[in-house]
Amino acid sequence: MDFLDLDELCRILAKIVNGMNTHEERVSLLLEMIAFAVIDGKLHERESIFLSIVAQQLGIERDEYLDLFHRESDPLPIKSEFQRIQQFYRLALLMYVDGECHDKEEVAIQQIAIDMGLNPAVTKRILAMMRESESKIIPPDLILQAFKEQHN
């Protein structure tokens, strides 16, 4: 599997990182992403780079970011559907950033999406679109549209 382009990821992340109200919420998102990144038993270099980029864009200092790898915490509930969709997409990007998609990651991301209250049919469809995409990146507008369609 091809690696995701980190420059393109940075551009996408810049579009989807906004909207987190408190530092505690941003840390919670990053903790969830760190836990997801090591679900296959190891942290790949590209996953580490990706997480570092996310931390930077969330305004989390490097020392605090590194300390998060030694913390365990239940993620805070994400209040708005838009923010839950953003977090789902960040996790999906993280799943593909190392060029490998493990079965454990597929199962975990589906459960996380259900726990966040996202429609399982839509999340499966988005993951299928990402799987079929050469770059593994789907425009955020297309993802939002998929979730809007479920409400109609």
State where each predicted segment sits.
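Small-residue-enriched hydrophobic alpha-helices in membranes
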Residues: M1-F36, K42-N152
